[in-house]
Amino acid sequence: MTRFLICEHKGQRPDREAKVYHITDIEENHEVHLFENEELVEMRIYYKSSRAWGETTAIDTAEKWCLGLIH
């Protein structure tokens, strides 16, 4: 699997961080890694074939995690 880091988010909550990757092996999918206290809590994959997910949706997820809107 080939992953390219698109962006990193660190928000108002210093213990939270998120990284957004672009995956190019099969389709143009996006992967979001959600960290809390430097530990991977969750990984979300947005498959382009199942819906019209895009880079914007992945980045929005990362921002919402860092702002504390996702628990």
Language model region names:
Residues 3, 7, 39-71:
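Mixed-charge, Lys/Arg-enriched low-complexity segments
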